[in-house]
Amino acid sequence: MPARSLLNVKGSPVATWDDDKWVEFAVQAQSASLSQFLHGEQGALLCTARLVEAVPWIDAKYYAATQVVDEARHVEAFARYLDEKMPATYPINENLKSLIDQV
């Protein structure tokens, strides 16, 4: 784990962490990472839904709508995993939010 390299830094607060604290840190870091995947999938859902709205041809709308359903399944899977298996869902990263807001 890259954070363990801080053990050698003089005065580092992580120098006193025991194994349980490192496990807690790893779980929270994983939860934060998966939360960003969830928000990314929510952004993809939004983008594909807008595509359905934007294209003028009915066949293109049908095709794009299948992608909307796929993205909705991804959102559902990540949300369920975070709710059932992880300790928290973190808010969207400001940089990711900025990208999604530009769409």
Predicted regions and their residues:
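Non-heme di-metal
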Residues: 1-103
